[in-house]
């Protein structure tokens, strides 16, 4: 079998992976705080005893685009936006701590604050609020609750968001969309980040996704054309 088939097959496989990444980005074009996933391709010459006439393809520049998204004013008390390099701490499915830029906080049926189903972590663990209470979030992340029918001067703090600071190179996205510390960062900063008291949030504001839907659609079309070309190479060899 001609080695060109393997070359084209490898390129087609990587193109499919690139299409999957682009499709995921498009699907999250309206997800608050979403960071577009990067996936580029690069040539890898085949080295060996044969002539240097074969070049394979592999993925490069994995990671996420940390460019901030635009701010949308929602006036919803439980929506918060953070400064650049600021993150909200959440509890992942395995109980470990993860980080997100998605500030769309929800209240589940048990009164626990969640983001995309993940419990929001405060400085003393997951945060719960009284049922039916009016919730406000201060700039420093302090969450206060006013029970129905109570006078305004009885507002009481129920917790404080754990706000942490990390650069894009210090975190890695998981399959669940939540970011976690890289191994290198854990070696220098510990298994979890400490709360940063200097960080501030804007209540009633959401950071939008940084996905450029038009550019992503163009990338999807270009990937489809590359895949079609690679299939023609395979069928003609």
Positions of the model-derived regions?
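Amphipathic alpha-helical polymerization modules
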Residues: 1-237
